[in-house]
Amino acid sequence: MAAQLNVEQLEVSLDGLTLSPDSEERPGAEGAPPQTPPSSAPGNGLGSGASGQQREPGEAAAEGAAEEARRMEQHWGFGLEELYGLALRFYKIKDGKAFHPTYEEKLKFVALHKQVLLGPYNPDTSPEVGFFDVLGNDRRREWAALGNMSKEDAMVEFVKLLNKCCPLLSAYVASHRIEKEEEEKRRKAEEERRQREEEERERLQKEEEKRKREKEDRLRREEEERRRIEEERLRLEQQKQQIMAALNSQTAVQFQQYAAQQYPGNYEQQQILIRQLQEQHYQQYMQQLYQVQLAQQQAALQKQQEVVMAGASLPASSKVNTAGASDTLSVNGQAKTHTENSEKVLEPEAAEEALENGPKDSLPVIAAPSMWTRPQIKDFKEKIRQDADSVITVRRGEVVTVRVPTHEEGSYLFWEFATDSYDIGFGVYFEWTDSPNAAVSVHVSESSDEEEEEEENVTCEEKAKKNANKPLLDEIVPVYRRDCHEEVYAGSHQYPGRGVYLLKFDNSYSLWRSKSVYYRVYYTR
């Protein structure tokens, strides 16, 4: 009786599975139902857990186990091994709490667990069990009843039996499935986030490299542009210095004498004035040079167009005369048709004279004039008013010419002029004539247009004779309107030879106003 009580109170833990047999259900106890072998129990839900003699060996059994594993994976949402692990964990946690399996069910759980871990029962390798070890004998008997059941079938039977004993297994597995799905979603989201961050990082890196390359290219282009501009500036500065040196060598004496007259005894002011005059002379020279280049280009283009239009219809002799008559010469920095030079196409009478007497001596090259301005217009006009002969009135529509013969002891002519309130046209010409009178004279004419109209009324023969007797005339400074009412206009020119300078004050464009001109001319050696 004592042995029976000890057995009834026995509670054994085998491989993590606790076995606590009840007195009512233990085999051999009074009032307990007879134990039936698990393999012959109908409707126990084990299916493939029967003895190996009832299974068909070979490929049919393997295919059946694989098919069962696929069905369970589809139903539970986990692979067979993962599902078995969840079921085993659920059994260990919930046994005796959420459900209370019977003694036979516990033996079945232990046997299936052993079948999964160790495979079929082998009496040669299993330790001996004592005669009084009731649980050990029951466990060995249950394990041996599984026969050659495969590991997969044992896991399937374990899950089925546990689900039959405790329906909460479905909720437990479902919660883990949801957790697994959430974890998978989080994993995918994290992977996508890392991928996006990596792509964004690569994109930003590429953009940064692109911006860096563009910046380097831009800096290189800017540096090249700055270098080119600096080289161009140095070249222009060097060219300017060369041109100014050449111009200053021509005008050094005139500017020095002019500055000495303006600021006698004040060397510093003289040097300042000379530098201003040299700079103005350079600017004027460059402006005239650009005008000459533009005029030459326009003349060449016009000549080319005329030759193309008229070349096909003119005979050979006419072509030669036309080409000779359209040649232009650059005199004093201005492009003009030299109608009175020995290089022009001669009139018939002049041609006969050249054949009989031979060609005339060629005229010397005329130097370019120097012109500048200075702002002391009020002091200049007050000084000029002291000499009444130095103030002339040019009436509306008139052209006043001041004739200044060259002086035997002089080599440069200087002029200065200003007006009261309005501008006036001004130009300088040189007449190749030996004037016996060295005094300055003033001549008034209505306008140059009237002279041209008078010349149109005479015949060609009379015009040719008149031109033959007329002295040669060269333009030094073309007639342009000057703002001499705002500042004093001054200039100088080197004598090209013996002759007469013609200073023209042109008011022919004014229909209503007369102009008062304050002027002064003098020569230097």
UniProtKB/Swiss-Prot annotation:
Highest rank taxon of the organism: Eukaryota
Domain ACB: 80-171
Composition bias, Polar residues: 319-336
Membrane topology: Peripheral membrane protein
Keyword list, A-Z: Acetylation, Coiled coil, Golgi apparatus, Lipid biosynthesis, Lipid metabolism, Membrane, Mitochondrion, Phosphoprotein, Steroid biosynthesis
Pfam families, per database record: ACBP (PF00887), GOLD_2 (PF13897)
Residues the record lists as N-acetylalanine modifications: A2
Single annotated GO MF: fatty-acyl-CoA binding
InterPro entries (alphabetical): Acyl-CoA-binding_prot_CS (IPR022408), Acyl-CoA-binding_protein (IPR000582), Acyl-CoA-binding_sf (IPR035984), FERM/acyl-CoA-bd_prot_sf (IPR014352), GOLD_dom (IPR009038), GOLD_dom_sf (IPR036598), Golgi-PI4KB_interaction (IPR052269)
Modified sites of kind Phosphothreonine: T18
Disulfide feature: none
Residue ranges the record marks as coiled coil: 169-254, 448-470
Annotated segments matching region Disordered: 12-68, 180-226, 319-346
Residue span(s) of domain GOLD: 381-523
Residue numbers bearing the Phosphoserine modification: S13, S20, S40
Cellular component GO terms held in the UniProt record: Golgi membrane; mitochondrion
Region Q domain: start-end pairs: 238-305
Biased composition (Low complexity): 52-64
GO terms, biological process: steroid biosynthetic process
Compositional bias segments (type: Basic and acidic residues): 337-346
Tissue specificity of this protein: Expressed in brain (hippocampus, olfactory bulb, neuronal and glial cells of the cortex), eye, submaxillary gland, testis (interstitial and tubular compartments), ovary (granulosa cells, theca cells at late stages and primary follicles), adrenal gland (fasciculata and glomerulosa cells), heart, liver, and steroidogenic cell lines.
Subunit description: Homodimer. Interacts with the C-terminal cytoplasmic domain of giantin/GOLGB1. Interacts with PBR and PKA regulatory subunit RI-alpha. Does not interact with PKA regulatory subunit RI-beta nor PKA regulatory subunit RII-alpha. Interacts (via Q domain) with PI4KB (via N-terminus). Interacts (via Q domain) with TBC1D22A and TBC1D22B; interactions with PI4KB and with TBC1D22A and TBC1D22B are mutually exclusive. Interacts with C10ORF76 and RAB11B.
Domain-level remarks: The central Gln-rich region (Q domain) is involved in binding to PI4KB, TBC1D22A and TBC1D22B. The C-terminal GOLD domain is essential for giantin binding. The GOLD domain is also involved in homodimerization.
Function: Involved in the maintenance of Golgi structure by interacting with giantin, affecting protein transport between the endoplasmic reticulum and Golgi. Involved in hormone-induced steroid biosynthesis in testicular Leydig cells. Recruits PI4KB to the Golgi apparatus membrane; enhances the enzyme activity of PI4KB activity via its membrane recruitment thereby increasing the local concentration of the substrate in the vicinity of the kinase.
The name this protein goes by in its record: Golgi resident protein GCP60
Organism (species): Mus musculus
